[in-house]
Design a protein with these regions (language model features):
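Short carbohydrate-recognition loop motifs
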Residues: 57-74
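Secretory/extracellular carbohydrate-interaction modules
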Residues: 73-138
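Short edge-strand/loop segments of extracellular domains
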Residues: 105-115, 181, 389-396
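Short, aromatic/His-centered strand-loop micro-motif at the edge of beta-sheets
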Residues: 140-163
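Carbohydrate-binding surfaces in secreted/extracellular proteins
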Residues: 157-186, 320-329
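Short, solvent-exposed beta-strand-to-loop segments that form ligand-recognition rims
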Residues: 178-197, 330-343
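An acidic-aromatic loop/edge-strand motif
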Residues: 219-223, 352, 356-405
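Aromatic-lined ligand-binding clefts that engage carbohydrates, nucleic acids, or primary amines
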Residues: 310-324, 368
Length: 405
C-alpha cells in the first residue's frame, strides 16, 4: 500500500517544526494554565541576584553549593522575580538575631506592603505558640499583634540552621519547618493588599539554599478559608470613623473630649468603615500609624433597641479604648505590650478575651462612641483596631444587619 504524504517537507524537517511550535506554545502559556508547576529556580547567593536593603555579605562554604548570604537588616530583595503562587524554600541561621524576627517577605508590592513569615527560636520550641508567626505588612507596619490565630508552635531549632518551606496558593499558605510532613502553620486568608510581588529575606540572619518553584502549590486550594464569624450577627461591624489625630502618651479622655470630637463631625465629615474577617475593624489598613506619638481616632455607631435593657459586650482591641453610650462613659481599657505587666490575655494580642463590659441601652436609638489609640508603649506601632461582639441581639437592630425573619 502506498502512503500519500500530507506535506512535501521531509519527515525530519516536519518533526523539527512540530517541536519548535510546541516549544513556542509552551513558552507563551503560564504554567498554572496547564496545571503544572514551572521548573524550580535555585537562587545563587551572590550580589548579582540580590538588591541590598541593608548590609549584605556573601560567602562560600562546603555543603552550600550556591553560597551563603548574611543579612544585617533590613533585608535583601531577590532581583527579577515576581512571585504569585508556588513554593519558596530556604535555610536560615538566626544565631545573630537578638530580636528573633528574621524571615521572609513575599508578595511585596513596595516597602510598606507585603506578607511576612518569621521564626522566633527559643529554648521552649516547639512547645511555644510563638515559634512561628505570620503577619501582613500594611501601611509599613507588621500586624502580628492582631492576628494571634496565625502564630503557632513548630519544631524550630534554637541554634543553627532551620529549613523553611512556604506553599502559597491564592489567599492561602502552608508553612513547613525542618521538612515536617504536616504544616506547622496554616494561614487561611493572607491579609495584605498585594496578591503578588517581590521576595525579600529580612532581619539579621544568614540564608542559603533558596529555591523558588512557581505554581507548585501541592494541591492547596486558592480560595480563602471560611470566616467563622461571617454568619454571626452579634458583631458590631459598621461604624463612622473620624480623621486621625495624635494623642500624648498617658493622656486620659473623658466626656468633654467625646462631646468635642462628635461636634466636629458637623464640619469635618466622618467616613464609613466596616469590619473585615473575624469582625475586625482594621484601622491600620485605612489610616496607617506614623512612628512617634500614638494616633487617635473616634468611631460611632447606632444600636436600636426595642426596650430598655443591658447587654454584655466582649471586646478585642489594640491598644487603648474609651467607650461611651448615650453620652455616658461605660468602659476604658488598656492593652499595652510594654511593660509586660500591662499585657492583657493572651500576651497582648487582640482577641475577644481582652475586655468585657455592660452596655446600657434605652428604648429606641442608642449612640455608641469609641476613642481608640495605637499606643503600644514601644519604639514602633503595629496592628491597630478592634472587634466588638454582643452576648446576644435579642430586641436589637444593628447597622448593616437584616432583621431575623
Amino acid at each position: 500500500m502506498t502512503t500519500i504524504p500530507t506535506s512535501t517537507a521531509p519527515t525530519g524537517a516536519r518533526a523539527s517544526l512540530r517541536r519548535a511550535l510546541a516549544a513556542l506554545t509552551l513558552a507563551a502559556t503560564p504554567w498554572s494554565a496547564i496545571g503544572a508547576a514551572a521548573p524550580a529556580q535555585a537562587i545563587d547567593m551572590v550580589a548579582a541576584r540580590w538588591e541590598a536593603n541593608g548590609a549584605l555579605a556573601f560567602s562560600t562554604q562546603d555543603g552550600f553549593p550556591r553560597g551563603l548570604m548574611t543579612v544585617k537588616g533590613p533585608g535583601a530583595i531577590l532581583k527579577d522575580v515576581l512571585f504569585t503562587n508556588g513554593t519558596i524554600e530556604y535555610d536560615i541561621n538566626e544565631d545573630g538575631d537578638e530580636d528573633e524576627t528574621s524571615g521572609i517577605w513575599f508578595h511585596q508590592r513596595d516597602r510598606a506592603t507585603a506578607e511576612y513569615v518569621y521564626l522566633r527560636p527559643a529554648p521552649d520550641c516547639p512547645g511555644s505558640v510563638e515559634c512561628i508567626q505570620y503577619g501582613p505588612v500594611v501601611q509599613d507596619h507588621v500586624q502580628w499583634d492582631v492576628y494571634p490565630e496565625y502564630q503557632a508552635s513548630a519544631p524550630v531549632r534554637q541554634h543553627g540552621w532551620n529549613h523553611v518551606k512556604l506553599v502559597i496558593s491564592g489567599k492561602r499558605m502552608n508553612v513547613f519547618i525542618n521538612r515536617e510532613a504536616t504544616p506547622s502553620l496554616q494561614v487561611g486568608h493572607l491579609e495584605s493588599d498585594s496578591p503578588s510581588g517581590q521576595i525579600q529575606l529580612r532581619g539579621n540572619a544568614t540564608y542559603a539554599n533558596v529555591v523558588v518553584t512557581p505554581d507548585a502549590v501541592e494541591g492547596l486550594a486558592p480560595a480563602p478559608s471560611i470566616d467563622p464569624t461571617a454568619a454571626d450577627a452579634r458583631y458590631v461591624r459598621h461604624w463612622q470613623l473620624s480623621p486621625a489625630s495624635t494623642i500624648a502618651i498617658d493622656t486620659e479622655l473623658g466626656l468633654a473630649d467625646m462631646l468635642e470630637a462628635t461636634a466636629l463631625a458637623a464640619t469635618t465629615p466622618w467616613e464609613p468603615i466596616a469590619a473585615e474577617r473575624k469582625g475586625f475593624v482594621n484601622l491600620s489598613r485605612s489610616h496607617g500609624t506614623p512612628r512617634g506619638a500614638p494616633d487617635l481616632v473616634w468611631l460611632k455607631t447606632t444600636i436600636t433597641s426595642e426596650r430598655a435593657q443591658t447587654k454584655q459586650v466582649a471586646l478585642g482591641f489594640a491598644r487603648q479604648v474609651w467607650i461611651f453610650a448615650n453620652g455616658a462613659p461605660v468602659y476604658t481599657g488598656k492593652n499595652f505590650y510594654y511593660p509586660a505587666a500591662a499585657r492583657t490575655t493572651p500576651l497582648a494580642r487582640m482577641t475577644l478575651d481582652n475586655g468585657t463590659f455592660a452596655l446600657p441601652l434605652v428604648a429606641g436609638k442608642n449612640e455608641v462612641v469609641m476613642a481608640i489609640s495605637n499606643d503600644l508603649r514601644s519604639r514602633g506601632h503595629y496592628g491597630w483596631g478592634f472587634a466588638m461582639r454582643l452576648a446576644d441581639i435579642d430586641g436589637l437592630a444593628l447597622p448593616g444587619v437584616k432583621p431575623a425573619m
